[in-house]
Structures are given as structure tokens and as C-alpha cells.
């Protein structure tokens, strides 16, 4: 299949969406699919190379740290992607590139699938002093996004439950975000581990469990 992935976030940015997109791209290509990426440039300059098309944008960090908004006209770049004729469009973000994804899907008459990465309820303090009003706005926005697509992917059952609670009517499928286990299966240096244990006061015979989580404001 030819699969076009659209995302406001891509390298060199580092966050969960970028990690998810890169993992998805790698695994789809490993299985023999052709994948192209439509994203935002880190400058006003649009470009296309190595299967990635980036549309000129400006910094929108006042809305959310690291965010960008499309400013450049995308006609030429969209036409090139239409000529490629993807079989399905997989959107990863709800803003700048989502509108391009919808436009391309409509022109090509192909399915548009969207992954709902962000629980916006947790970030309403960025735009609303009222938690209740913020949740209502998120629910309405999520319903609008769902009405534009043929199906949504939720990374967890919790997120699917939230979407259903918002009144989303399109099909919602739970597909957990994958992890590249190869990064964690490398043998460490025994001497380095011993030095680290000693520096932390952990006896050699003790089992160590490490929990990796996140802190969000």
C-alpha cells in the first residue's frame, strides 16, 4: 500500500507523537509498504526530500511549547502528493496538517484515518480558566475531528472511553503505540553497572526495577 502520514510534529522535534510516527513509519516500511510524510518545516521555507514533504510554518510556542502553524501556500506540494496517489491517509495531528490530510483524502477519494494522541483535557489550562468550559470545548472539537474522518485510532482503552464520552460517532479502534524493544535489549557493561550500583548504594545482589514515566504541566 501507499500510505501518507500527516503530522504537525516530526524530527528534529522530540516528543511522543514524533516517536510514534517514526515507529509507525519504520514498521510499515519493514512490511513492504510505501510511506511518505507530510509535516511542517522548522522555517518559512517549504521543501521535499527523502519521502518527507515539509510546509513552511511559524513558531506558535505561545500556544504550546514547540508548536508551529502553517503559513506557506501548500498547493504545489499537495499536488505532488496527489500525483503519488496514496491508498490511505493517516493523520496524526488535528491542526495544520489535518486540513491538508482532509483535502488530499477528499480529492483522491481515499480513507482518512486519524490517531488521537493527546488527551486535551489535561491541557485546557493553556486556553481556558474554567475546567468545565475547557472540557466542553475539547469534546466539541473532538466530535468535529471525528466527523471529518473514516475512523479513529486510540492508543488506549481509556482514550477510546473519553472519545465515546465526548459523543464521537465514527469507529474508534484501540491500537497501542509500539515500542522498539531493540533499544532496551543491549547488554550493558558489567563494570559500569557495578560502579553505578556502588554510587547509588545498591547492593550487588539486589534486583533493580526502573519505571520510566513523564511529568506534564
Residue ranges and their predicted role:
Residues 49-79, 91:
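A short, charged, and often flexible helix/loop element on the N-terminal side
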Residues 39, 53-56, 135, 139-191, ...:
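Donor nucleotide-sugar binding/catalytic pocket of nucleotide-sugar-dependent glycosyltransferases
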Residues 89-122:
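An aromatic- and histidine-rich active-site surface loop
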Residues 113-140, 182-187:
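Acceptor-binding helix/loop patch of EC 2.4 sugar-transfer enzymes
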Residues 191, 203-217:
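Conserved donor-binding/catalytic core segment of Leloir-type glycosyltransferases
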Residues 81, 85-89:
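Proline-aspartate-enriched helix->loop->beta-strand connector
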Residues 1-45, 49-56:
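N-terminal subdomain of nucleotide-sugar transferases
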Residues 6, 155, 211-213:
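Short hydrophobic "strand-cap" motifs at the C-terminus of beta-strands
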Amino acid at each position: 500500500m501507499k500510505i501518507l502520514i500527516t503530522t504537525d510534529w516530526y524530527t528534529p522535534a522530540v516528543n511522543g507523537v514524533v516517536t510514534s510516527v517514526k515507529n509507525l513509519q519504520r514498521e510499515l516500511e519493514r512490511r513492504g509498504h510505501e510511506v511518505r510524510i507530510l509535516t511542517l518545516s522548522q522555517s518559512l521555507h517549504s521543501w521535499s526530500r527523502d519521502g518527507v514533504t515539509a510546509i513552511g510554518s511559524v513558531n506558535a510556542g505561545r500556544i504550546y511549547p514547540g508548536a508551529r502553524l502553517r503559513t506557506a501556500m501548500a498547493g504545489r506540494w499537495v499536488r505532488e502528493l496527489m500525483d503519488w496517489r496514496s491508498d490511505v491517509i493517516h493523520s496524526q495531528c488535528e491542526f495544520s496538517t489535518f486540513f491538508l490530510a482532509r483535502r488530499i483524502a477528499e480529492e483522491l477519494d481515499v480513507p482518512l484515518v486519524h490517531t488521537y494522541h493527546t488527551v486535551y483535557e489535561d491541557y485546557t489550562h493553556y486556553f481556558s480558566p474554567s475546567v468545565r468550559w475547557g472540557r466542553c470545548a475539547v469534546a466539541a472539537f473532538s466530535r468535529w475531528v471525528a466527523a471529518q474522518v473514516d475512523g479513529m485510532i486510540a492508543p488506549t482503552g481509556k482514550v477510546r472511553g473519553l472519545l465515546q464520552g465526548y459523543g464521537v460517532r465514527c469507529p474508534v479502534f484501540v491500537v497501542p503505540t509500539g515500542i522498539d524493544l531493540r533499544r532496551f535489549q543491549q547488554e550493558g557493561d558489567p563494570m559500569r553497572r557495578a560502579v553505578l550500583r556502588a554510587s547509588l548504594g545498591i547492593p550487588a545482589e539486589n534486583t533493580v526495577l526502573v519505571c520510566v514515566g513523564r511529568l506534564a504541566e
